[in-house]
Every structure is written in structure tokens, then in C-alpha cells.
């Protein structure tokens, strides 16, 4: 079964950056800046992913601008957040 966090991130990234999964030349480790991620698109992705811009999560996501890094951070964030 596919990881739902990865799928959500991948769909948002592909939509915002106008790319296809095949454009991830290094797979999930591809640096999203190489595919057109800039500060404006980063903010748009945070909105699409439901990330609170006032939290520390955006700065943690900015440390590793890849699908792989974001899956790790968002999965951890979901584990830490109360349900």
C-alpha cells in the first residue's frame, strides 16, 4: 500500500510545480529547487499541505527540500500532533 503522506506531498508538488513524478530524476531525493521550487511556490505548497506557517514545521521542511525529507518531517509531525 502506498504511503498516504507521500502521496499527498507528491500530488501537491506535481500540481504546484507543474511536473510529473518522472521528473524526479533522483527519485524522492530530488532537490525540489531543481524543479522550480521558489519561495512563492513553497508558501503555496505549505497551504496545500495544511502546514501552519506560524509553526516551526516550515523551517524544518526548508532544511530538506525533497519529497523524501518532507515525508519524514510531515510523518513525524503527524505523530507529534494530538488527535
UniProtKB/Swiss-Prot annotation:
Gene3D superfamilies to which the protein is assigned, alphabetical: ACP-like
Mutant lacking the gene: phenotype: Deletion of the gene cluster mmaABCDE causes a significant decrease in the intracellular accumulation of zinc in Sauton's medium where metal concentrations are relatively low.
Any GO BP: fatty acid metabolic process
Sorted keywords for this record are:
Fatty acid metabolism, Lipid metabolism, Phosphopantetheine, Phosphoprotein
Residues bearing O-(pantetheine 4'-phosphoryl)serine?
Answer: 39
Any idea where the Carrier domain is?
3-83
Q: In which pathway does it act?
A: Lipid metabolism; fatty acid metabolism
Name the domain of life: Bacteria
InterPro entries xref list: ACP-like_sf, PP-bd_ACP
Q: Which cofactor does it need?
A: pantetheine 4'-phosphate
Q: Which family does it belong to?
A: Belongs to the acyl carrier protein (ACP) family.
User: What is the purpose of this protein?
Assistant: Acyl-carrier protein (ACP) involved in the biosynthesis of a unique class of isonitrile lipopeptides (INLPs) that seem to play a role in metal acquisition in M.marinum. Is the dedicated ACP for the loading of activated acyl groups catalyzed by MmaC.
Q: What is this protein called?
A: Acyl carrier protein MmaB
Query: Which source organism?
Result: Mycobacterium marinum (strain ATCC BAA-535 / M)
